[in-house]
């Protein structure tokens, strides 16, 4: 699993460049959430460059773009799941099925919303 905030267009473009350089032949499943005050279309466009599949969710209710709305911005196949923990489970399952790298990106709030921060503290 790779975790990167990639919470704005510039950071998303940088992540996409790094993914294409370092993991150019590695299939990827993306778990993504974007805040309403960010340019979600540009973030999705950049992240679509390396993602074979996207699972879209909401990391911060009230501030986050709805998952369904975000999923429509991706050029790659994308599914929507409003509940971030369910979205994480879906993304993990897809990554395992596709033997793909799971990339968590698009919001600085997403790791905490899916419980990764707690897993790291408990490890």
What residue spans do the PLM features occupy?
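C-terminal helical cap/extension that packs against the catalytic core
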Residues: 1, 41-101
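Nucleotide phosphate-binding/pyrophosphate-handling subdomain across enzymes
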Residues: 1-53
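Glycine-rich beta-strand-to-loop/alpha-helix junction loops that act as flexible
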Residues: 6, 34, 59, 104-108
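Short glycine-/acidic-enriched loop or helix-start segments at secondary-structure transitions
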Residues: 12-13, 40-42, 65-67, 113-116
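Active-site catalytic pocket residues across diverse enzymes, especially alpha/beta-hydrolases
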Residues: 19, 23, 95, 118-122
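Residue-level recognition of the N-termini of beta-strands and the immediately preceding loop/turn
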Residues: 27-28, 100-102
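Glycine/aspartate-rich loop-and-adjacent alpha/beta segment that forms the canonical ThDP
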Residues: 107-123
């Amino acid at each position: 699993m790779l975790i990167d905030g990639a919470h704005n267009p510039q950071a998303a473009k940088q992540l996409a460049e790094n993914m294409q350089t370092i993991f150019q032949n590695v299939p990827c499943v993306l778990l993504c959430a974007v805040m309403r005050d960010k340019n979600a279309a540009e973030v999705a466009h950049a992240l679509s460059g390396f993602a074979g599949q996207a699972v879209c969710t909401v990391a911060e209710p009230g501030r986050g773009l709805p998952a369904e709305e975000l999923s429509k911005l991706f050029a790659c196949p994308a599914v929507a799941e409003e509940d971030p923990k369910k979205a994480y489970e879906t993304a993990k399952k897809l990554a395992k099925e596709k033997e793909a790298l799971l990339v968590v990106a698009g919001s600085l709030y997403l790791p905490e919303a899916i419980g990764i921060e707690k897993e790291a503290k408990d490890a």
